[in-house]
């Protein structure tokens, strides 16, 4: 009896350490070097991805590099090989799209995250007129996401944009804007990437079913199970 009780107690104590994150996004979290629903660690992982993007851009051939800048009033396409064009648009803030040599294809996702301008001063060379001078939005690349598949958990307070970057294709017309979700979060279609930008509490984790479960309730169920059995 004593040994059984000890085993149950040790299992309850060690459970938080061995508890898996999410079946769907565990590999993503490990790859980004972040913890679930921790904004600070998440931003660090995203900045790591950003440095990879700009490193690829810096070593690329400038003749094959194309930069599309979006601002409030104008959308300008600049290319070193062909003349650019201008179109009017009503985007809310300045954003950058970049393509480098190697023609990497995939969905480019704006997760609504920002970083300080000082951190990006060495890598961001955009001269767009952004009202918020101290912050700039950047983009995260998915891995091996097909053209017709995208999966995002969209916050009710954010509007995300998906842009497919492909070799020899015009970026215009490929932008898909995901409007605000009616509930707390909404999942769209299928893909490997799942960003939950609506989670703010540290006492929550994302389960394999994509729902948010409070830690307190979860451990209460475990405790009741141990008492009964």
Swiss-Prot record:
Glycans are attached at residues 87, 184, 189. The keyword Nuclease does not apply. It is found in: Cell membrane. Residues 63-92 are annotated as: Disordered. Predicted GPI-anchored protein which may have a role during host infection. Residues 209-229 form a propeptide. Keywords: Cell membrane, Glycoprotein, GPI-anchor, Lipoprotein, Membrane, Signal, Virulence. It is a lipid-anchor; GPI-anchor. This is Predicted GPI-anchored protein 19. A lipid is attached at residue 208 (GPI-anchor amidated glycine). Induction: Up-regulated upon interaction of cells with host macrophages and upon milbemycins A3 oxim derivative (A3Ox) treatment. Residues 81-92 have a biased composition (Polar residues). The gene is PGA19. Residues 1-20 form the signal peptide. It comes from the Eukaryota. GO terms for cellular component: plasma membrane; side of membrane.
């Amino acid at each position: 009896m004593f040994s059984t009780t000890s085993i149950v107690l040790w299992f309850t104590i060690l459970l938080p350490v061995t508890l898996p994150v999410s079946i769907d996004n565990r590999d993503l979290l490990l790859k980004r070097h972040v913890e679930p629903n921790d904004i600070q660690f998440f931003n660090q992982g995203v900045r790591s991805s950003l440095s990879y993007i700009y490193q690829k851009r810096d070593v690329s051939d400038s003749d094959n590099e194309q930069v599309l800048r979006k601002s409030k009033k104008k959308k300008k396409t600049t290319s070193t090989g062909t003349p650019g064009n201008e179109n009017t648009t009503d985007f809310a803030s300045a954003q950058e799209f970049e393509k480098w040599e190697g023609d990497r294809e995939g969905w480019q996702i704006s997760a609504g995250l920002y970083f300080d301008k000082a951190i990006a001063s060495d890598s961001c060379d955009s001269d767009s007129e952004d009202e918020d001078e101290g912050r700039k939005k950047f983009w995260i690349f998915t891995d091996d996401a097909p053209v017709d598949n995208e999966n995002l958990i969209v916050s009710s307070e954010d509007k995300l944009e998906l842009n497919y970057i492909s070799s020899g294709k015009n970026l215009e017309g490929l932008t898909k804007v995901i409007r605000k979700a009616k509930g707390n979060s909404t999942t769209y279609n299928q893909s490997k990437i799942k960003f939950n930008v609506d989670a703010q509490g540290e006492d929550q984790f994302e389960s394999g079913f994509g729902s948010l479960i409070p830690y307190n309730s979860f451990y209460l169920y475990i405790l009741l199970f141990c008492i009964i059995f």
